[in-house]
């Protein structure tokens, strides 16, 4: 291990955040990457120093030990040189810059053994919120998202010429390198070619040999009538672009419904609340209700309707997906009792209450008489 000042190597302060350290590392790796500096021994040494510094500073425990003890914290841990083999070492991959840009876009890391081969793009997920009316009628939305797009400069090949690859100079085509730490020997995936055994000879200057680059994409999405909460629409070939001609992934648009002021959804049925007064509940009648389209509908209230009774309007619910049919509209009746009465209303209610109680008592006495009459026979 060298006696470098790791903070100076990365060009950051000792109080730098992990994000600042990572950003500085990415910038330096791009600048001194061997693809951009072929045969430059100075650039090769700088990359080694950059990787060594990043390996320590990206790890909070190693960084803390370094801050307290400097290089002495690591000199007794392995008994050997920190780096003794060719190429990029110390467990840090200079191609991590591409991992961070592309591989982590959907949380999927790229395999080191296919780093310089065709690789399919990741499937993407996009969450979209719709009003209930939009879900009922269907709607076209323009969505905007960042993703990996096929590089137009190299047509996705990653190379500026047809003879795109050559044998890796670091591992000589084997895909592995060997290192020694103390008495132990280790065989590692070559970090120049990432195990492929070959490298891009003349990489594209726009995508750095990746065959794709990050940019914002605008896409028109047609959402059919009748989608529900949690519905998922698959758009084949609209996901992340593959690397170096790999297959493009798919895009999944996931639906969330914004709560409605009037209706709630249960399957294909729409539920709503209706307040009626106690006289309408007792006598029955006809009221107007509005459906999801705003149309006024006549609803009959049967005489003697009880609180929380449900009334159904057939075919007035949600549009059924990929169909010309609709679910039902379920109306929940809430009987409202007046909080205050006029003198005449109060007198009428007292009279009604008396008559109802008398009818109830008469019915009870009639049942008793019938019981004794049947028992005496």
Swiss-Prot record:
Binding site for Zn(2+) 1: 151, 154, 204, 207
One Gene Ontology term from the biological process aspect of the record: DNA replication
Xref: InterPro entries: DnaJ, DnaJ_C, DnaJ_domain, HSP40/DnaJ_pept-bd, HSP_DnaJ_Cys-rich_dom, HSP_DnaJ_Cys-rich_dom_sf, J_dom_sf
Residue spans, zinc finger CR-type: 138-216
Cystine pairings recorded for this chain: none
Domain J as annotated: residue spans: 5-70
Gene Ontology CC annotations of this record: cytoplasm
GO MF assignments: ATP binding; heat shock protein binding; unfolded protein binding; zinc ion binding
Alphabetical list of PROSITE patterns matching this protein: DNAJ_2 (PS50076), ZF_CR (PS51188)
SUPFAM superfamilies: Chaperone J-domain, DnaJ/Hsp40 cysteine-rich domain, HSP40/DnaJ peptide-binding domain
Note on how the cofactor is bound: Binds 2 Zn(2+) ions per monomer.
Localization: Cytoplasm
Cofactor requirements of the protein: Zn(2+)
Annotated keywords: Chaperone, Cytoplasm, DNA replication, Metal-binding, Repeat, Stress response, Zinc, Zinc-finger
CXXCXGXG motif repeats: 151-158, 168-175, 190-197, 204-211
Family: Belongs to the DnaJ family.
HAMAP family registered for this protein in UniProt: DnaJ
Record comment regarding domains: The J domain is necessary and sufficient to stimulate DnaK ATPase activity. Zinc center 1 plays an important role in the autonomous, DnaK-independent chaperone activity of DnaJ. Zinc center 2 is essential for interaction with DnaK and for DnaJ activity.
Listed PANTHER family: DNAJ HOMOLOG 1, MITOCHONDRIAL-RELATED
Subunit comment: Homodimer.
Purpose: Participates actively in the response to hyperosmotic and heat shock by preventing the aggregation of stress-denatured proteins and by disaggregating proteins, also in an autonomous, DnaK-independent fashion. Unfolded proteins bind initially to DnaJ; upon interaction with the DnaJ-bound protein, DnaK hydrolyzes its bound ATP, resulting in the formation of a stable complex. GrpE releases ADP from DnaK; ATP binding to DnaK triggers the release of the substrate protein, thus completing the reaction cycle.
Protein's UniProt name: Chaperone protein DnaJ
Native source species: Orientia tsutsugamushi (strain Boryong) (Rickettsia tsutsugamushi)
């Amino acid at each position: 291990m060298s006696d470098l000042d790791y903070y100076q190597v990365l060009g950051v302060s000792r109080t730098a955040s992990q994000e600042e350290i990572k950003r500085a590392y990415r910038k330096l790796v791009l600048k001194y990457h061997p693809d951009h500096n072929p045969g430059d021994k100075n650039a090769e040494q700088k990359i080694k120093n950059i990787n060594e510094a990043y390996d320590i500073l990206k790890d909070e425990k190693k960084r803390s030990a370094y801050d307290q003890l400097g290089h002495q914290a690591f000199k007794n841990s392995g008994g050997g040189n920190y780096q003794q083999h060719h190429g990029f070492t110390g467990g840090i991959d200079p191609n991590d810059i591409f991992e961070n840009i592309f591989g982590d876009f959907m949380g999927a890391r790229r395999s080191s053994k296919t780093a310089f081969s065709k690789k399919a793009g990741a499937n993407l997920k996009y969450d979209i919120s719709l009003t209930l009316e939009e879900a009922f009628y269907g709607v076209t939305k323009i969505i905007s998202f960042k993703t990996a797009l096929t590089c137009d400069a190299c047509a996705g090949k990653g190379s500026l010429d047809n003879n795109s690859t050559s044998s890796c100079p670091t591992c000589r085509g084997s895909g592995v390198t060997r290192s020694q730490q103390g008495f132990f020997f280790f065989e590692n995936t070559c970090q120049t070619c990432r195990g492929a055994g070959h490298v891009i000879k003349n990489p594209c200057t726009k995508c750095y040999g990746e065959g794709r680059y990050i940019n914002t994409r605008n896409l028109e999405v047609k959402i059919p009538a009748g989608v529900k909460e949690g519905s998922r629409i698959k758009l084949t070939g609209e996901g992340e672009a593959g690397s170096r001609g790999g297959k493009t992934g798919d895009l999944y648009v996931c639906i969330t419904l914004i709560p409605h002021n009037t209706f709630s959804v249960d399957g294909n049925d729409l539920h709503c609340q209706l307040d009626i007064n106690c006289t309408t509940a007792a006598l029955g009648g006809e009221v107007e209700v509005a459906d999801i389209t705003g149309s006024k509908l006549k609803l009959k209230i049967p005489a003697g309707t009880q609180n929380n009774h449900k009334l159904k309007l057939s075919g007035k619910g949600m549009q059924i997906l990929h169909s010309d049919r609709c679910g039902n509209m379920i109306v929940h009746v809430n009987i409202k009792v007046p909080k205050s009465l006029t003198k005449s209303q109060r007198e009428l209610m007292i009279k009604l209450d008396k008559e109802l109680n008398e009818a109830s008592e008469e019915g009870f006495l009639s049942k008793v008489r019938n019981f004794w009459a049947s028992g005496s026979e």
